[in-house]
Amino acid sequence: MRLPTRLKAFLFASLSLVVALTLSFGVAEGIVRLKNASMRDYNTEMWRYGRELKLPSADPRLGHEHIANSHAVLQSVNIRTNNWGLRGGPVSDAPAPGTRRILMLGSSIALGWGVDEDKVVSSFLEKKFEADGQHVEVLNGGVGNYNAERYVERFLTRLAPLQPTDLLILAFVRDGEELTRDSGNILLRNSQLALTAWVAATRVMAKASDGLVEHYKRVYAPGSPSLALMQAELGKLAKYAREHDIRVTLAMVPDVHVDLTRYPLGFVHEVFAQAARDNGFAYVDLLPAFQGLRPEDIWAMPGDPHPNARGHALMADAIYGVLAQAREAKGTR
């Protein structure tokens, strides 16, 4: 049976359109990937981080975890994980007798996104202890896109067997935000072109929404669900630390993509300072270490407001004195 001429024309036109769109998408995808091969696009490199070094967690509270014993070159920096999913080389399951072991918790800033392994806070601290004649292990437990709930639960359920003598929380203003697991649709998981379009749309919507300060005022408002969850998680961590004789230091990292000379998020720092007081943690506000610096002085690269190696060195300088005093006051176990 022969198809009517009009139907044949319609089917041919539809098929031609599908082929043309597919070819156009393929060409555009290739152009975007070629452009991003320089590893200078922050959003694309974060997307690759999620694909190459993360996997969904069986624990919904964690959302995702690092793939153990893996590595990837992201933003022109090699990031490797050991069998615990920590950034860096192999570590023993437990510290040697009498050895101080500091485990750093946090998100991508603690991880050292965009910074070589030997120039992140954990590495600088180890070198400082060594220069003072002390053998101290500083382990890097940072994971990108983690909040307080995620890094506390990861420690309690995954990393506690490492038996740290100290915990160093490298906290950030986003740590009180509630996060949900979102693996994205098939296009966002596999297409850099789709990612680029999604980022552009997100930026347009962000400009139309409330500003950054108003957002964080809602997150940290007294009685807000997000604040209550963060406080509960830090309280849970404090209880475990007391029961296991672990010293905890909370170092508050400022948001370095805003004006540091007229820093508008001091109220968030006070929330974390109060949480530290409530839980018996030592507290270090890292804002003074960054004041007077311009974004281009401390950003990992243009468009990426993570602290660079200089920023990590400044943070380590500010934190080291507190950690050294903690040892003198209590000694190692």
Placement of each model-derived feature along the sequence:
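Hydrophobic membrane-insertion alpha-helices, especially the h-region
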Residues: 12-29
